[in-house]
Amino acid sequence: METVVIVAIGVLATIFLASFAALVVVCRQRYCRPRDLLQCYDSKPIVDLIGAMETQSEPSELELDDVVITNPHIEAILENEDWIEDASGLMSHCIAILKICHTLTEKLVAMTMGSGAKMKTSASLSDIIVVAKRISPRVDDVVKSMYPPLDPKLLDARTTALLLSVSHLVLVTRNACHLTGGLDWIDQSLTAAEEHLEVLREAALASEPDKGLPGPEGFLQEQSAI
C-alpha cells in the first residue's frame, strides 16, 4: 500500500510539471504577436524555462527531506515584458499559485516516502490517494482558464478550487504521517498563495458590473416613468 501511495503522489507531481510545460506552449501560441512568433520561439526566457523543467524532472539522489522542485527562473521570466503580453497583470499570480502548489506537492511526496512506518492505517493511505487524485483536474482547469480572453471570475474560482484541494492534501498527509513540529513552511506557503489569490479575488470583484445607486440620468428616467 505504501508503494501505491508513493506512485500516486509521484504521478501527481509529474502532472504539475506537464502543466507548467503546457502553460509555456499556451502562452507562446496565444499571447505572442504573429510577427514575433519566430522571435518568441527562440527567446531565451522560454528556453530557460523549458530547460529548467526538463532538468527538474530527472530523478534526484538527495535526501528525501531535501527534495524540492522549484523554478528559479520564474521571477526573471515574469519580468520580461517581451515574453508575455498580459495587460491584466493576473497571469503572474496564477503562475505563482501553480508554483506554490507544485512545491508543496513535491515536499509532501518526500514526507510520505519518509514516513511509511509512521502511517496510521491503510485507510489513511487511501485518503491521501483520493485527495491527490482531485488535484490534477484542478491544475488542468487553472491552465485552461489562462487562455485568452481572461475571465477574472473564472480564474478566481479555479485557483481557489486548486488551493483548497492542496490544503486538503496537506491536512490528510499531516494526519496520516503524524506530522507535528517544524512545518511552518507549509503555513507560509499557503499564506503566500492566499495573497496571490486575494489579487485575483479583487480583480473578479472589479469585473462585476456596479450595483450601486443609480446616477442622475437613471434617477431622472425613474422619475419620468413615475
UniProtKB/Swiss-Prot annotation:
<dbReference type="GO" id="GO:0005886">
    <property type="term" value="C:plasma membrane"/>
</dbReference>
<dbReference type="GO" id="GO:0031642">
    <property type="term" value="P:negative regulation of myelination"/>
</dbReference>
<dbReference type="GO" id="GO:0010955">
    <property type="term" value="P:negative regulation of protein processing"/>
</dbReference>
<dbReference type="GO" id="GO:0045063">
    <property type="term" value="P:T-helper 1 cell differentiation"/>
</dbReference>
<feature type="topological domain" description="Cytoplasmic">
    <location>
        <begin position="1"/>
        <end position="3"/>
    </location>
</feature>
<feature type="region of interest" description="Disordered">
    <location>
        <begin position="207"/>
        <end position="226"/>
    </location>
</feature>
<protein>
    <recommendedName>
        <fullName>Transmembrane protein 98</fullName>
    </recommendedName>
</protein>
<feature type="region of interest" description="Required for interaction with MYRF">
    <location>
        <begin position="1"/>
        <end position="88"/>
    </location>
</feature>
<dbReference type="GO" id="GO:0070062">
    <property type="term" value="C:extracellular exosome"/>
</dbReference>
<dbReference type="GO" id="GO:0048715">
    <property type="term" value="P:negative regulation of oligodendrocyte differentiation"/>
</dbReference>
<comment type="function">
    <text>Functions as a negative regulator of MYRF in oligodendrocyte differentiation and myelination. Interacts with the C-terminal of MYRF inhibiting MYRF self-cleavage and N-fragment nuclear translocation. The secreted form promotes differentiation of T helper 1 cells (Th1).</text>
</comment>
<dbReference type="GO" id="GO:0005615">
    <property type="term" value="C:extracellular space"/>
</dbReference>
<dbReference type="GO" id="GO:0005789">
    <property type="term" value="C:endoplasmic reticulum membrane"/>
</dbReference>
<keyword id="KW-1003">Cell membrane</keyword>
<keyword id="KW-0256">Endoplasmic reticulum</keyword>
<comment type="subunit">
    <text>Interacts (via N-terminal region) with MYRF; the interaction inhibits MYRF self-cleavage.</text>
</comment>
<feature type="topological domain" description="Extracellular">
    <location>
        <begin position="25"/>
        <end position="226"/>
    </location>
</feature>
<keyword id="KW-1133">Transmembrane helix</keyword>
<keyword id="KW-0812">Transmembrane</keyword>
<keyword id="KW-0472">Membrane</keyword>
<feature type="transmembrane region" description="Helical">
    <location>
        <begin position="4"/>
        <end position="24"/>
    </location>
</feature>
<dbReference type="GO" id="GO:1900181">
    <property type="term" value="P:negative regulation of protein localization to nucleus"/>
</dbReference>
<dbReference type="InterPro" id="IPR029668">
    <property type="entry name" value="TMEM98"/>
</dbReference>
<comment type="similarity">
    <text>Belongs to the TMEM98 family.</text>
</comment>
<dbReference type="GO" id="GO:0005783">
    <property type="term" value="C:endoplasmic reticulum"/>
</dbReference>
<keyword id="KW-0964">Secreted</keyword>
